[in-house]
Amino acid sequence: IGRNMQIAIASGGERITGMGFRSLGVMDDENTGKRYLSAQLDLDVGECIYGLGERFTPFVKNGQSVDMWQGDGGSCSELAYKNVPFYLSSKGYGVFVDSPADVSFEVGSENVERVRFSAEGESLRFYVIAGAGANPLKDALSRYTHLTGRPALPPAWSFGLWLTTSFTT
């Protein structure tokens, strides 16, 4: 594969994202013996990224590095209970990284003009889910939940009072 390799991902005849030379990587950690795989998808100028589950950070994820692992960090940390390796783009598509391992994302930062994601393992499976119609973000989210499963509606009693020790009043 040469330096001119390009993969264009299109929907309705229009390019929504893509991958170029050096968009796929393999990294071996000599200290731990672990292998990590990474992929990068292009971002257009002005394209915003949303999602990645529960975060105590700005809603727009551009410029953020997000490491996904479960942890009890409270509200003063970036650790969260509900990590979801799925993001939506303002261009009307979503990306789901299908990995049971800890997944790291770097979203359009000073170092990356793309969304880069990586995980430990010998393979890295991800889905680019194009939205369609009048509301492509809603459609992409619906297609994502069709792929991964939709939750049942919790019982009415579960919507009651919620107490926390993280805040004082």
Task: Place the predicted regions along the sequence by residue.
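Catalytic and substrate-binding clefts that recognize carbohydrates or anionic sugar/phosphate headgroups
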Residues: 1-154, 164-166
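Structural preference for beta-strand elements that scaffold enzyme active sites
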Residues: 156-160
